A protein has these predicted regions:
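Surface-exposed, secretory/extracytoplasmic low-complexity segments enriched in Ser/Thr/Asn/Gly/Pro
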Residues: 1-127, 132, 179-181, 186-192, ...
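Exported/periplasmic cell-wall-interacting domains
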Residues: 104-105, 119-219, 224-225, 231, ...
Length: 249
């Protein structure tokens, strides 16, 4: 059945369950192909049990359709988790879209469209080369941001990106090497998980300022939130061409 564009529940790495109501991730039946297949079966008098023709596929038919390999992005905490086959592979602070300029990264359930090494992200007034490019919502994607000294905290409010999720280079590399086109990206907001860090986290994992916070490695959960008790996923029911002009850096 169709699950694309339908609400999805996620037991987050913070122990709370959220409902993600937007985004195109999920199964989607190809109406034209399915109709043609059914007509053919009827004409031939055949009776069979078969899977529908899909124009878009998801990870699972049981429980939540996104399975146990996905990127979990908490836009409130500015922190993400990448689970591969149910195990936490990497987590990190990030910087999302600039809220003050109206470029906030949208919440929703999406999928990695493709991945590309050494892309150039282009938009009005900028052309930014990145080493690891993983778009998931049009021109919005995950990528390294080696021009940033810090990540996380409240940077995104006034110093955020054009909409993309900016990552420390080492984190972007790890995700890139272990993610595939079609893998889910689940973005959400969660009240109560706002980071207390005002300066963000440096590339090496130390705090940028002497604000009231301890230095937290980029592989640790935000201070105001509880990290997962284990590394298991939460229970859930060649250089290429430049990226098109609409890409957000």
């Amino acid at each position: 059945c169709n699950t694309a564009y339908k609400p999805k529940t996620l037991k987050t790495s913070y122990g709370k369950t959220v409902t993600i109501t937007t985004g195109n991730y999920g199964w989607k039946i190809d109406q034209a192909k399915e109709t043609a297949a059914l007509v053919s079966l009827i004409k031939n008098g055949e009776q069979t049990s078969r899977e529908p023709e899909y124009s878009q596929k998801a990870a699972s038919h049981s429980g939540n359709d996104y399975g146990n390999t996905y990127v979990e992005i908490n836009l409130t905490a500015q922190h993400l988790y990448f689970y591969a086959n149910g195990k936490l592979l990497v987590e990190s602070d990030f910087v999302s879209g600039n809220a003050a300029k109206g470029w906030s990264t949208p919440a929703g359930a999406y999928s990695i469209t493709y991945k590309q090494r050494n892309a150039t992200l282009k938009g009005q007034g900028y052309a930014t080369p990145v080493s690891y490019w993983m778009p998931f919502n049009g021109g919005i994607g995950l990528h390294d941001a080696n021009w940033r000294k810090t990540f996380g905290g409240t940077i995104y409010k006034n110093g955020g990106s054009h909409g993309c999720v900016n990552l420390p280079p080492a984190v972007a590399k790890t995700i890139y090497e272990n993610i595939s086109a079609g893998d889910p990206v689940l973005c959400y907001h969660l009240d109560g998980t706002e980071s207390s860090k005002t300066g963000g986290t440096k590339k090496d994992g130390t705090a940028e300022t002497t604000a009231a916070t301890t230095a937290v490695p980029t592989t640790a959960a935000p201070e105001t939130t509880a990290a997962p008790a284990t590394t298991a996923a939460p229970e859930t029911t060649a250089a290429g061409p430049s990226v098109p002009e609409t890409t957000a850096a």
